[in-house]
Every structure is written in C-alpha cells, then in structure tokens.
Design a protein with these regions (language model features):
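Short, intrinsically disordered, charge-balanced linker/junction segments flanking boundaries
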Residues: 1, 180-182
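Conformationally flexible catalytic loops at phosphate/diphosphate-handling active centers
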Residues: 2-69
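Short secondary-structure junctions and interdomain/linker hinges
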Residues: 3-7, 71-75, 100-104, 108
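Hydrophobic residues at beta-strand termini and immediately following loops
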Residues: 13, 166, 182
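Glycine-rich, anion-gripping cofactor-binding loops and their flanking helix/strand elements
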Residues: 60, 78-168, 172-175
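Active-site donor-nucleotide binding/catalytic segment of nucleotide-sugar enzymes
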Residues: 65-84
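Conserved acidic residues
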Residues: 72-74, 137-138, 180
C-alpha cells in the first residue's frame, strides 16, 4: 500500500521452498539453509525487467518479436485479468502466433464475444501428463500466474523453456522462478 501498488495489502515474498505440507524430502531441492535459495542464474539476475512503465517501448517490442519468431511451439498463458478488455487483443495475439491460450478461470478468456477457438480450459489434465509433443519452447504469460499446481510444475520442469511475463500491474508474481523476461 505504501509503495503505491493499486492492490493494497500485506507484503508477500514469493520464495519457492519445498511443498510445506509434504513430509518427504526432495533431493536437490532448495531449502531455507541452501546458499542458492535466493540466488539468480549464475552471473545473471534471476529475472530481467525490460520495461518498468505502463507502455511498451519499440525496443521491447522488437525483443519480444525476435523471441516469438525464433520459437517453434508457443503457448499463451492467461492469468487473472481485472477487465474483459484484454480478452480480444490477447486472443488475436495467440491466433497470430498459432498458440493455444491456457486460460485461468479468472482470466476473462473463457467467456465473452472474442474468439475462443484456441482457449484451453482443461489444461490441468495436459499439465499432469506432461506430454513431450505439447511442450512449448516459449510461454507468453499475461497477468498473474494461474493457480494450477500441475501447470506450474510442468512449466518449471521444462529446463530450456523461455518465458515472457506481461504484467500491467507490475506485481512480478513469478512463483516458478523461470521467467527470463518481465
């Protein structure tokens, strides 16, 4: 609230520890005692924020376009959106990229007058199975990360996956710690 965030509330740190209710130790997992718990990726920062303004610069658009052109299998992930106004442009972006839209129930993408032909609502089943043939090499996420644990696990398991996060509220909600561009 004091920082001027449009969503008032307590401060929250998204630090991915092990599943807190699971009594099973996960080998090689990051723990509170691990020196790597808050580290980035080697000499690189964990995330790179290209633009801290509510508009997109031409340099940022060129960077995103270059990454989209280089990708073979793109997936658009639609997290929580406050307004239905983004549904139409988001569906056009996905159609232009030939990408499915993984739609969180609060994404405003499941209903409305926009093109919903590429909207996937039952993505938990796909994410649980983790089929190699459907694994994306680029994810473009709009809004918050969906609440689906299988989706987060699947995206986290894809080591070479490139993720771009478009977050107009600047919440930087990235629980998978895998997005390279915000």
């Amino acid at each position: 609230a004091a920082s001027g965030d449009p969503r008032p509330g307590p401060v929250h740190l998204n630090i991915s520890w092990r599943d807190p209710l699971s009594p099973v130790h996960v080998p090689d997992s990051v723990t509170a005692e691990s020196v790597f718990a808050l580290e980035g990726r080697g000499d690189e920062p964990l995330n790179r924020v290209l633009n801290g303004t509510p508009w997109v610069s031409s340099a940022t658009l060129e960077e995103i376009t270059r990454r989209i052109d280089a990708a073979e299998r793109i997936m658009v992930v639609a997290g929580r959106q406050r307004s239905q106004t983004l549904a139409e442009p988001l569906s056009r972006i996905a159609a232009r990229c030939g990408a499915p839209v993984i739609a969180e129930p609060t994404s405003q993408m499941r209903y409305g007058s926009h093109d919903r032909s590429g909207v996937v609502t039952t993505y938990d089943h796909i994410a649980t199975e983790q089929p190699a043939g459907l694994a994306p090499d680029l994810v473009i996420r709009f809004g918050e990360m969906p609440t689906s644990k299988p989706l987060r696990i699947w995206l986290s398991s894809l080591g070479d996956l490139e993720q771009i996060v478009v977050d107009p509220l600047f919440t930087f909600n990235e629980p998978t710690r895998t997005a390279g561009l915000i």
